Amino acid sequence: VMNTRAHRKITVIDGNVGFSGGFNLADEYINAKVKYGHWKDTGVMIKGEAVWNLTLMFLTTWNASLNTFEDYDKYHPRHYICPEISPNGYILPYGDSPLDNKPVGKNVYLNMINQAQKYIYIDTPYLIINDEIKNALCLAVRRGVDVRIITPGIPDKKMVFKVTRSYYEPLVNGGVRIYEYTPGFIHAKNFVCDDKIATVGTINLDYRSLYHHFENGCFMADCQA
């Protein structure tokens, strides 16, 4: 129980507009307060029916301590205010929970790595991975994929930063390109692949996010991700 953490970042407005990504509600996330150099983060705004997924994730967390059942349908908007520009793909907000033994976040990341044909670019503040992900990244390079990872240049946690750097050598030896964001700390959690699919969310590329935390992300396909 002590290992689990609500790491999701969700804002829903009137059931029609949703925000998610790496941002927390703190001054350093908008660089109003500088702690680790320039703070780099990402988030997405979505409109329409996809927002309902974010609403459900928020409600299940809000009511986590209650033993009573609540009808979530009463929070469902009667009408969605859709964007003026029709999307040319789809967006699927998804959640990850340590309680169901289904590593959704890890599976999304692995599927993107394994499907990549031209490139896959990754932003992550922490890089602490198991052999399954490490091998997938190196095998992607072997089949001709341009694999690049951006990590922080200035750490927020020095010990975790040292552990992150310990993974550089086997990945670089396998052909993965790793760059450090030298102006400061990159807190973004992004995967983008082949100009076709991407995900933005809260899930770090480390063991705790992939297995122990409540997380969420937004998967995008065939749109301007």
Model-derived features with residue positions:
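Charged, low-complexity intrinsically disordered terminal segments
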Residues: 1-225
